[in-house]
A protein has these predicted regions:
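Electropositive phosphate-/nucleotide-binding environments in soluble metabolic enzymes
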Residues: 3, 24-27, 42, 81-88
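Short alpha-helical segments and helix-capping/turn motifs at coil-helix boundaries
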Residues: 7, 24-29, 33, 95
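Short glycine-/small-residue-rich flexible loop motifs, especially phosphate/cofactor-binding loops
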Residues: 10, 30, 151
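Active-site beta->alpha loop and helix N-cap motifs at the rims of alpha/beta catalytic domains
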Residues: 38, 47-50, 55-150
Length: 151
């Protein structure tokens, strides 16, 4: 007998009060997760690095375009721009969930640069910028003295 559920994940979110968050902003993984009931996703530098390893073909042209358009940018600036764009793509995929749930679900969690863990001003500036990118982005900041001050 065929199951009415698409997967064990779909069964879990359909039969329990569990909210499923995808621990990746990979386009392929997140698309699958949303189709099976996920209501959120997270990103951070390590996750985005793994996404690039898995989905480089989806991002390689954009990386080259950014380098070409911004010849004076450092590797760090290019990296953070790609980090931002991958996070934005995840937020875009989750936007229908965000709208359906009136903002209570459907969020993409994006992390500020952990290298700024001692710099409250830099954490706050990046957090405000990330928050401006999409209505369903929530920002993670380091729980350090500077991070708490930034919050």
């Amino acid at each position: 007998m065929a199951s009415k559920f698409k997967s064990p994940l779909h069964e879990m979110v359909s039969t329990t009060p569990t909210d499923l968050w995808n621990d990746s902003c990979s386009i392929h993984e997140l698309t699958y997760a949303i189709e099976h009931g996920a209501v959120g996703a997270t990103s951070n530098p390590t996750i985005v690095y793994n996404v690039l390893q898995q989905e480089l073909g989806l991002w390689e042209d954009r990386i080259h375009q950014l380098i070409e358009e911004n010849p004076n940018w450092s590797e760090v600036e290019i990296t953070w721009k790609i980090f931002e764009e991958i996070g934005l793509k995840g937020a875009e995929l989750l936007l229908p969930v965000f709208e359906r749930e009136a903002g209570k679900k459907g969020r993409l969690s994006i992390q500020t640069n952990p290298a700024n863990y001692r710099n409250a001003e830099a954490v706050a500036k990046q957090a405000v910028y990330f928050d401006s990118l999409a209505p369903n982005i929530q920002v993670k900041a380091p729980v350090t003295q500077a991070g708490i001050k930034a919050i």
